[in-house]
Amino acid sequence: MKRAMGTSEAPRTLRTTLPARAYTDGAWFAIEMDRVLARMWLAAGRVDQLDHAGAFIRRDVAGASVLIVRAGDGSIRAHHNVCRHRGTRLSVEERGTFQGSIQCPYHAWTYGLDGRLLAAQLGDLPSRFAPWAMQDLRLAHRIEYDVATNWKLVVQNYNECLHCPVIHPLLNRMHHYLGAENVPPAETYCGGAMGFKDGVETLSTDGKRRREFLPGLRGRDREVVNYFAIYPNFLLTLHPDYMMTITIWPRDCGRTTLVAEWHFHPDEMKKKDFVCADAIDFWDRTNREDWAISEQSYLGISSRGYQPGPYSERERQLWEFDQFVLARVNQSP
């Protein structure tokens, strides 16, 4: 009987415990975190722990810190506990209640309970721009450009006027190309004001102003144009009598859509003799000059003969923008 039983059974596989390194080796642990816990649903808590809007619990696992939040619409959301700005943790508490929004303790970037970015710190820009009352201005004209260049070259071109005497004969008649009064560098924007040459009143095809000053402007604000690049994709140009903006939409590394919009005060737009073609034509011409040279820059950079060149002292804002991009490209996901 024993011999018969022995011949009818297959040899058993010896089952053993895991090797010691499965419990003690940091590299093994890291693989478990990445391939097991980070890729599967985890038991994080009970729904009744989040019994009101803004209630949250924090869970730290597999190299991530996650905020699980009851949103205003009653849904439950999970957000990385990381600010998009500089990576600061949004909350160090294990549980609590957000009062309507989630605000980073570092630079006050503010998010909705649903995770949407609601506000980003722009330093003193809101107070600086308050006299223009941009919220009161109304859109009069819009032009969309399809430009064969990298989006960063558009920002860099906007941030200096050393090219103005060569590329922009009309603009160069309005400003002195070395006349920029730049504000101190900031992390999320750069820019400043440029005064007019004698006899120039605004940026138009002939330098004449055909509209009243914007109501909130006084003194020096009536005598300059403010140029600000607000990172990453907004170019704001404020004149004594109107506002021109450019929104940058990268499509691929060598193609960018640029949307230019001209805004005026509604009281001016209601007038029977209201005109805006002088401002639109001025900037459409100037913009196209910029887009053409930006396309040529991209072609040159795409050549195998390209090597990075030095910035001059008057191109510091371009370097600052480069650092803004590099800091985010090089940060950990």
Can you say where each PLM-predicted feature lies in the sequence?
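Short hydrophobic core segments
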Residues: E32, V82-C83, V154, D290
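Short, contiguous pre-domain boundary segments
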Residues: K2-A20, Q135
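Soluble FAD-dependent oxygen oxidases
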Residues: E32, A64-V66, S332
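Rieske [2Fe-2S] iron-sulfur-binding domain
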Residues: Q49-S127
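Basic/polar N-terminal segments that are highly enriched at the extreme N-terminus
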Residues: M1-A10, S127, N330-P333
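C-terminal catalytic domain of Rieske-type non-heme iron oxygenases
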Residues: R70, S75, L118-P333
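Non-catalytic accessory segments flanking enzyme active sites
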Residues: T16-L18, A22-V61
